[in-house]
């Protein structure tokens, strides 16, 4: 069997697994944007079942064999396919020792935690969320302990997951350098800066007008409105289920319209990536594979 034939078989496995991943994502979107409070527990349970199915499909012996063999020898594959194998292998190495039961329990814990976090945030009472957070931390430590390639600390491992190569020492050096420039600048502004009018920024602005302006901003950024939806949530985010189904969220404050403007422009920046990635990326399961740093930094340029 050629390497291309192996990749074709792997793609079929990923095609099926991706159906479950999209289903989980759509349930999560609904839970964060429109699900009634009393329906969140059921949504979380449904998501855990679907996540378990995805996990099992990507942890079969056949899947592992294809990924490891193609990682060892990728001759004949396209550059995009080689990058896909690189990402899949890295994920496999991190997750291969996690039992399905632990993964299922982690999914349940994360889903339960969201509703707890929402209640705590709205009540401004951290104690309402602390128990759920402690449970998540415990499960995270269990999963990290199962990895064969260890990092100096749990936090180092999570930083590397978020941004490949990230570490505490790297960020300490970065923030030390940033602090050396930023602190003097802030002090200079405080002592020498001219007063700037800000009273208009808290002027009441009807939510309906903010929503209409948000839609205008998204069109101004060049987004395809027929492949886009705009909704509200407690903490804004952008997600997608292919280039033709991109979902942007924002949060309106009647007395802080500027917050929504910045949010919409930034989330619209994420949406631009999602709508414009090459079709090949989606076909070969390479979409959304850029680093978080790239996604966030370039999306912020639109503000």
Predicted stretch roles:
Residues 106-257:
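Contiguous, non-catalytic segments that form substrate-binding/exosite surfaces or channel walls
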Residues 287-293:
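Divalent-cation-assisted or electrostatically stabilized phosphate/pyrophosphate-binding catalytic cores
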Residues 301-303:
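Conserved small/polar residues in nucleotide/adenosyl-binding loops
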């Amino acid at each position: 069997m050629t390497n291309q034939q192996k990749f074709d078989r792997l793609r079929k496995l990923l095609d099926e697994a991706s159906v479950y991943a999209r289903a989980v994502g759509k349930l999560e979107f609904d839970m964060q944007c429109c699900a009634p409070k009393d329906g969140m527990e059921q949504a979380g349970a449904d998501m855990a079942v679907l996540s378990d199915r995805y996990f099992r499909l990507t942890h079969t012996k056949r899947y592992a064999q294809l990924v490891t063999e193609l990682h060892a020898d990728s001759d004949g594959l396209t550059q995009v396919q080689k990058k896909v194998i690189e990402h899949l292998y890295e994920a496999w190495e991190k997750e291969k020792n996690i039992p399905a039961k632990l993964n299922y329990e982690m999914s349940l814990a994360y889903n339960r935690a969201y509703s707890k976090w929402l209640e705590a945030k709205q009540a401004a009472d951290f104690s309402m969320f602390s128990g759920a957070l402690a449970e998540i931390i415990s499960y995270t430590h269990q999963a990290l302990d199962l990895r064969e390639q260890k990092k100096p600390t749990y936090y180092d491992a999570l930083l590397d997951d978020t941004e490949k190569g990230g570490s505490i020492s790297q960020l300490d050096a970065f923030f030390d350098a940033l602090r050396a420039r930023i602190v003097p600048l802030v002090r200079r502004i405080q002592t020498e800066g001219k007063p700037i009018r800000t009273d208009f920024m808290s002027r009441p602005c009807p939510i309906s007008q903010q929503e209409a302006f948000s839609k205008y901003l998204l069109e101004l950024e060049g987004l395809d409105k027929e492949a886009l939806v705009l909704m509200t949530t407690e903490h804004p985010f952008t997600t997608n289920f292919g280039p033709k189904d991109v979902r942007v969220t924002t949060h309106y404050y009647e007395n802080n319209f500027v917050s929504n403007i910045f949010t919409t422009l930034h989330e619209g920046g994420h949406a631009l990536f999602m709508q414009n990635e090459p079709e090949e990326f989606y076909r070969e399961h390479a979409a959304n594979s850029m680093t978080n740093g790239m996604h966030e930094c370039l999306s912020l340029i639109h503000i």
